[in-house]
Amino acid sequence: TEGPDFYIPMVNTTGVVRSPYEYPQYYLVNPAAFAVLGAYMFFLIIIGFPINFLTLYVTLEHKKLRTPLNYILLNLAVADLFMVIGGFTTTMYSSMHGYFVLGRLGCNIEGFFATLGGMISLWSLAVLAIERWVVVCKPISNFRFGENHAIMGVSLTWVMALACTVPPLVGWSRYIPEGMQCACGIDYYTRAEGYNNESFVIYMFTFHFLFPMFIIFFCYGRLLCAVKEAAAAQQESETTQRAEREVTRMVILMVIGYLVCWLPYASVAWFIFTHKGSEFGPLFMAVPSFFAKSSSIYNPIIYICMNKQFRQCMITTLFCGKNPFEGQEEDSSTKTEASSASSVSPA
């Protein structure tokens, strides 16, 4: 059922469909599902906010973390905080009431900040992939990734994110409630006159999903090849073999984390876009969005907690200046040094 500023995934044969801005949507799913959604959002908030805020705090506390590469990692934490503060809190609040209680303006604000955080995060991963490819594979001889390059990379993530999230605010597509009608996203659902949803969705999928996904797969594919070549050149070096396994594990986790977070949501959104008029339930879009929102937890775990330097500084901060695991970290220093010498360090 299509309204002036909403789309309900239900045929209004019984006349029960109501605006998601004004009435509870308990006719869509069991009311318990809204409680589950609220609890899930609360879980993401209590986990996502502390771990991303801790990342920012630790970086400010430890000067040695203020390196060009870590600018991009820090940008990931900022993006995740946008999602937590701007998106998860409003979704949790709306789910407690069973509908989007913040109105049309609130939908624009929530949709903008949630999408902005996701786009900044996605483009940060792409920039990080480019940085790893350039540093490890050295396609440009004598190139050194410096502060100016990092600032350019971070700026690029914001420019590309805004290029995707601002148009729906000014008339090229729009933000509407989706799934269980407690969160807002891009209008994949309608051909509403005057919004040109079709052209925007094609633009968004091409330049803000497929393109960064290609960058990530290309760069990490080349990175993996470089690690294997380095190991093949030093077959007797156990430390290099360990470095290869470490990088391989990290790359696999990066790709899996990316796909788990975004591929289900993007696939369902594209299906809805290309099959307008098909019947589907509210959970058809709500469940994939759960995976996309969980990226606020995956990102710091994969990209920061697996970084030795970040991990050491976090432990030092949490234990008030002392690292109780310092002996274990020293035992792994040989591997880290050999990894760096071979230009295959994952961190």
From Swiss-Prot:
Ranges of biased composition (kind: Low complexity): 335-347
Residue ranges of the region described as Disordered: 326-347
Glycosylation positions in this chain: N12, N197
Stretches in topological domain Cytoplasmic: 59-70, 131-149, 222-249, 306-347
Gene Ontology terms, MF aspect: 11-cis retinal binding; G protein-coupled photoreceptor activity
GO annotation, cellular component aspect: membrane; photoreceptor disc membrane; plasma membrane
InterPro entries, sorted: GPCR_opsins, GPCR_Rhodpsn, GPCR_Rhodpsn_7TM, Opsin, Retinal_BS, Rhodopsin, Rhodopsin_N
Disulphide bonds in the chain: C107-C184
One annotated GO biological process: visual perception
Biological function: Photoreceptor required for image-forming vision at low light intensity. While most salt water fish species use retinal as chromophore, most freshwater fish use 3-dehydroretinal, or a mixture of retinal and 3-dehydroretinal. Light-induced isomerization of 11-cis to all-trans retinal triggers a conformational change that activates signaling via G-proteins. Subsequent receptor phosphorylation mediates displacement of the bound G-protein alpha subunit by arrestin and terminates signaling.
Name listed for the protein in its UniProt record: Rhodopsin
